[in-house]
């Protein structure tokens, strides 16, 4: 969405938080850390990966940091889609998926939601395409149970299923516990929404 230059607005359309980050975040940004700003940061983000791996119960090499989850998603589309390999996604979801497909000349397979705005998992079975599912789907406020995502993974063993969990902390089941069981699963999370760090531009892509 549009970014006002005066920053006097709280952008509800992108869910900017009116609250400060956790006191633990403020405490972590000590004078010692501020002094490090004159130096280039670790290009592999080893400390971040170690902390994230401990939090999510994964190995550091299963996590890729990004400049916000948008970058993680963009890279995923670059890696798993092209003019011969479409991206399948719902007709009512984040607009960025269609924008990126247009920029990268990726064919879009747009799948309609049901009349009640829920997603029918069977519409995604056996597509032989890369799939991205926002879960929860913020534009509709509806989330799929983890078991239904698992059904989509089983039905597409040779194709990547990307689960965009930008709003998972607001409700819904994370698919992170499925990562070690499915090589075709990529889970993407952001620190910009419930974690109140939009200005830090930090996202994580997690997979097997």
Role assignments for model-derived ranges:
Residues 27, 31, 54, 78, ...:
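Short, well-ordered alpha-helices that flank and scaffold nucleotide-derived cofactor binding pockets
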Residues 37, 47-86, 104:
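Phosphate-binding glycine-rich loop
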Residues 79-134:
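PLP-dependent aminotransferase-like
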Residues 15-18, 69-70, 94, 135-139, ...:
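Short glycine-rich anion-binding loops that position phosphate/pyrophosphate groups of nucleotides
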Residues 1-39, 51, 126-127:
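N-terminal "arm"/small-domain region of PLP-dependent enzymes with the aminotransferase-like
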């Amino acid at each position: 969405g549009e970014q006002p230059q005066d920053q006097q607005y709280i952008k509800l359309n992108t869910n900017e938080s009116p609250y400060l980050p956790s006191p633990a975040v403020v405490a972590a940004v000590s004078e010692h850390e501020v002094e490090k700003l004159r130096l280039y940061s670790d290009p592999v983000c080893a400390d971040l990966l170690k902390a994230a791996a401990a939090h999510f119960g994964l190995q550091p090499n299963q996590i890729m940091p990004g400049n916000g989850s948008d970058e993680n998603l963009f890279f995923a589309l670059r890696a798993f889609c092209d003019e011969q390999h479409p991206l399948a996604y719902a007709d009512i979801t984040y607009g960025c998926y269609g924008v990126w497909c247009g920029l990268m000349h990726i064919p879009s397979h747009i799948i309609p939601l049901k009349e009640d705005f829920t997603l029918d998992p069977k519409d995604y079975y056996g597509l032989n395409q890369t799939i991205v599912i926002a879960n929860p789907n913020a534009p509709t406020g509806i989330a799929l149970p983890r078991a239904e995502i698992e059904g989509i993974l089983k039905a597409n063993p040779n194709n990547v299923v990307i689960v965009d969990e930008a709003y998972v902390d607001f409700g819904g089941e994370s698919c992170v516990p499925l990562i070690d069981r499915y090589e075709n699963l990529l889970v993407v999370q952001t620190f910009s929404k419930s974690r109140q760090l939009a200005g830090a531009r930090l996202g994580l892509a997690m997979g097997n």
